Curated annotation (Swiss-Prot):
The lineage of its organism: Bacteria, Pseudomonadati, Pseudomonadota, Gammaproteobacteria, Enterobacterales. It comes from Escherichia coli (strain ATCC 8739 / DSM 1576 / NBRC 3972 / NCIMB 8545 / WDCM 00012 / Crooks). NCBIfam families: apsK (TIGR00455), PRK03846.1 (NF003013). It catalyses: adenosine 5'-phosphosulfate + ATP = 3'-phosphoadenylyl sulfate + ADP + H(+). SUPFAM superfamilies: P-loop containing nucleoside triphosphate hydrolases. This is Adenylyl-sulfate kinase. Keywords: ATP-binding, Kinase, Nucleotide-binding, Phosphoprotein, Transferase.
């Protein structure tokens, strides 16, 4: 479909985003977790979702591996495919924000331009970039899926941090030390959400 096909029109919903947020009791927002493989993105995002669920917050977690089983199963790991992967996830996340959910996304998303693209799509005030900053040496030592070992052996191409660049955020809303305890990181995130009046519980 062409982007500006004149036969395709946008239909407004009778229920507004604000009405949905009022129903949920909190604002809709995306927490975009970014960092190297093994940095702890998925672990921290999952722990935060669990904490938010216990507080009665309506959430959904989009995980990098999971979306490649369906939504992005046709994509590889070239720069072009990575960009399309993030574009699709950004669109899904935006729809969920419009539904009034707190959306957590855990993706390496190595390029600043793609993260900025999603920020602009979702809109300022509804996009929180979470940089899980863990040194490459620590990520490689963890290597939960054995991917660094494969990349070092030349068995895995385009692996971020080894033969594909990772562009660290320059002004993330929150910068987490990935070597800290997960419980500490979750508390920092909850504090941020409360300070920004996204959740009140």
């Amino acid at each position: 479909m062409a982007l500006h096909d004149e036969n395709v029109v946008w239909h407004s919903h009778p229920v507004t985003v604000q009405q949905r947020e009022l129903h949920h009791g909190h604002r809709g927002v995306v927490l975009w977790f970014t960092g190297l493989s093994g940095s702890g993105k998925s672990t921290v995002a999952g722990a935060l979702e669990e904490a938010l669920h216990k507080l009665g917050v309506s959430t959904y977690l989009l995980d990098g591996d999971n979306v490649r089983h369906g939504l992005c199963s046709d994509l590889g790991f070239s720069d072009a495919d990575r960009k399309e992967n993030i574009r699709r996830v950004g669109e899904v996340a935006n729809l969920m924000v419009e539904a009034g959910l707190v959306v957590l996304t855990a993706f390496i998303s190595p390029h600043r331009a793609e993260r900025q693209m999603v920020r602009e799509r979702v809109g300022e005030g509804r996009f929180i970039e979470v940089f899980v900053d863990t040194p490459l040496a620590i990520c490689e030592a963890r290597d939960p899926k054995g991917l660094y070992k494969k990349a070092r052996a030349g068995e895995l191409r385009y692996f971020t941090g080894i033969d594909s660049v990772y562009e660290a955020p320059e002004s993330a809303e929150i910068h987490l030390n990935g070597e800290q305890l997960v419980t500490n990181l979750v508390q920092q995130l909850l504090d941020l959400l409360r300070q920004n009046d996204i959740i009140r519980s």
